[in-house]
Amino acid sequence: MKRTDYLDRLLAKFGSSFDIYMPYQIHGIEYPAFAYHYTHQEKYVLVKEANMWKADSYEYVLFVNTEVIDEAVIEKAKDIIENYFEPELVRKGEKYPAKDHMYSYLTVVIIGNHYSDSKLASKVKRYHFDKGYQFSIRGYSAGRMVAVTMDDEKVITNNAASKSKKVFKAVFDEVRANKPGFSTICEKQGVTPFKQEL
């Protein structure tokens, strides 16, 4: 299966609840796509002015398309989660996230043909990044890593991303069943992906 076909269908799944940006740059390096989701919840008594609590949740997903998943690719994914997503998108350069921040999921999805070394799959599985703010009063951030290989159609995730494994696995069958990809859906609906403001 072609990586581009897999990614196109995967973006169609994300596109139903995420804003999709194509392409997306991080520190001068261009990636095929980025997905963003935001949820705001609040509880109030009778009128909105009598607010009991508010909670904001975020998900950031970067999609990486590479022929071979090697150690450098995995290390770069870790770097993006820990040194771009968390400080720049979650905290926006501040000491803590915004007041009503509940959680942020920081995900890098690596799509490749195969690993340069089969032992690298365990590096993806073992990856862990979890950061709380003010004893979790300002919520937390969790790093999630997903690696998908075309040659053997396997999906490897770290523990934080394990619940989403079925979603990524199902894409293989959906591509074979000729389900529409993101580009086809956009064309039919006459819409285009979001553009990153640089």
Positions of predicted regions on the chain:
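Short glycine-rich, low-complexity/disordered patches
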Residues: 20-31, 89-107, 111, 134-141
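Charged, structured surface patches that assemble and position nucleic-acid processing machinery
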Residues: 125-195
